[in-house]
């Protein structure tokens, strides 16, 4: 039975992978970098495959540093950055880079929608403010 918890945080510039014991003590951690793409002014995108690759590069080293066998992992928690959506094909393959929280290409659309629907109503419906 597993006795350790694995945390994976997909951040803006890197993923962080960490293993904790049941008392919350850090056993080992590591970081895997990836890039932000800026193809046009106001655009900020990332390739979800880069996220996956960074986790796959980082995880083995964290487990090795912690001296914990993967079968001893009881659970995995994953945190992602804001509300980025990933477009996948019918086989689960990434179709394109995804806009991330600092992408502002939808600014005009957000202004129009916010003018028609109260900001508090939008928040009540989806749990997030409408912003580019």
Regions found by a protein language model. Give the residues of each.
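N-terminal glycine/serine-rich phosphate-binding loop of ATP-dependent small-molecule kinases
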Residues: 1-96, 108, 112, 124
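Carbohydrate-associated surface elements
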Residues: 103
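Short, surface-exposed amphipathic charged segments that create phosphate/polyanion-binding patches used
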Residues: 113-117
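Active-site neighborhood for divalent-cation/phosphate handling
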Residues: 118, 123-132
